[in-house]
């Protein structure tokens, strides 16, 4: 009797019984541990080779990214220039290129960097740098605002244009003459006026919380002149019309419960109509106010008080 030895079947990739490939790649003979070990070693080497190739591709991608230039942070600023020392030279816009990566976030920071590092002759007002004093008011990209509260537009593909407040006489560069503006502010008598005399100068004039709340949105004005410089009615009648800023302060004292001249204040503003009624409710003042106040509403309220005859 002749005994015939049969060959073992190929292990299945799924269950190890039947034809196929073990580990999904290489054939394995059931009952031969060495063959299975060799298949596992080959699969591990192939996986290691694939990982190495992916690492090389990542390295090449990183080199390509490093070779490409970084986005530029240099931005152009076009600043209005005019000097009384050279009256024959026409006003013009001068370009300065500033690296935003080495500068503060506000337009005032840019102007100070230009003055310190690029051109010491540039003239502009500034003081508090916190939106309190109103000194650095100017027109930035067509909008009247204070430079210390205006963030820099980080889009380096377009230039930022900085000019003086419109409809103001220019003293030099970004500095305008505010003499008439302050005279109009003074004309509304922006101080407490009393008919009842107090016993001593140190006597306090008490207010209820409700009376004090009526002053919110009025006393915060910083006299930056952005609203008046944006008002077409003020452009056309600068000598007669007091402008939004002065009228806002006038209403602040009309609304103050401690003041005893409210009726006289309203009547003085309404005389001749030009001081108060030249306002056409265009509301450019409200739109441009950097402190988010509403001078147009204050002017409208004073017109109503005058018409009703009861401030």
Curated annotation (Swiss-Prot):
Subunit (UniProt): Component of complex II composed of eight subunits in plants: four classical SDH subunits SDH1, SDH2, SDH3 and SDH4 (a flavoprotein (FP), an iron-sulfur protein (IP), and a cytochrome b composed of a large and a small subunit.), as well as four subunits unknown in mitochondria from bacteria and heterotrophic eukaryotes.
Coiled coil region boundaries: none
Name of the protein: Succinate dehydrogenase [ubiquinone] iron-sulfur subunit 2, mitochondrial
Superkingdom of origin organism: Eukaryota
Record: residues binding [4Fe-4S] cluster: 221, 224, 227, 289
Annotated source species: Oryza sativa subsp. japonica (Rice)
Gene3D superfamilies, per the entry: 3.10.20.30, Alpha-helical ferredoxin (1.10.1060.10)
Region (Disordered): 1-70
Function: Iron-sulfur protein (IP) subunit of succinate dehydrogenase (SDH) that is involved in complex II of the mitochondrial electron transport chain and is responsible for transferring electrons from succinate to ubiquinone (coenzyme Q).
Family annotation (PROSITE patterns): 2FE2S_FER_1 (PS00197), 4FE4S_FER_1 (PS00198), 4FE4S_FER_2 (PS51379)
Residues given in the record as [3Fe-4S] cluster binding sites: 231, 279, 285
Its membrane topology: Peripheral membrane protein
Entry's cofactor comment: Binds 1 [2Fe-2S] cluster. Binds 1 [3Fe-4S] cluster.
Family from the record: Belongs to the succinate dehydrogenase/fumarate reductase iron-sulfur protein family.
Positions with a binding annotation for [2Fe-2S] cluster: 128, 133, 148
Localization per Swiss-Prot or TrEMBL: Mitochondrion inner membrane
GO biological process, one term: aerobic respiration
Cofactor: [2Fe-2S] cluster; [3Fe-4S] cluster; [4Fe-4S] cluster
A single cellular component GO annotation: mitochondrion
């Amino acid at each position: 009797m002749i005994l015939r030895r049969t060959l073992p079947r190929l292990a299945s990739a799924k269950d190890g019984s039947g034809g196929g490939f073990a580990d999904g790649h290489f054939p394995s003979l059931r009952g031969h541990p060495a063959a299975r070990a060799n298949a596992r070693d080959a699969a591990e080497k192939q996986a290691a080779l694939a990982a190495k190739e992916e690492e090389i591709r990542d390295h090449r991608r990183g080199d390509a990214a490093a070779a490409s230039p970084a986005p530029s942070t240099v931005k152009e600023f076009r600043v209005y220039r005019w000097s009384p020392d050279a009256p024959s030279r026409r006003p013009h816009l001068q370009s300065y290129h500033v690296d935003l990566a080495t500068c503060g976030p506000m337009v005032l920071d840019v102007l100070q960097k230009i003055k310190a590092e690029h051109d010491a002759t540039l003239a502009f007002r500034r003081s508090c740098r916190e939106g309190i004093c109103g000194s650095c008011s100017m027109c930035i990209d067509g909008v009247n605002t204070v430079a210390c509260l205006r963030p820099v537009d980080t889009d380096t593909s377009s230039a930022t244009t900085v000019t003086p407040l419109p409809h103001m006489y220019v003293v030099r560069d970004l500095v305008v003459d505010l003499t008439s503006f302050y005279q109009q502010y003074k004309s509304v008598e922006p101080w407490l006026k009393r008919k009842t005399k107090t016993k001593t100068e140190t006597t306090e004039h008490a207010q209820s919380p409700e009376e004090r709340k009526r002053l919110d949105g009025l006393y915060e004005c910083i006299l930056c002149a952005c609203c008046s410089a944006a008002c077409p009615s003020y452009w056309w009648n600068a000598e007669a019309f007091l402008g939004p800023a002065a009228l806002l302060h006038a209403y602040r004292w009309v609304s103050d419960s401690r003041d005893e001249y409210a009726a006289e204040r309203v009547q003085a503003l309404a005389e001749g109509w030009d001081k108060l009624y030249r306002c056409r409710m265009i509301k450019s003042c409200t739109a441009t106010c950097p402190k988010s106040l509403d001078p147009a509403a204050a002017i409208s309220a004073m017109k109503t008080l005058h018409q009703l005859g009861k401030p």
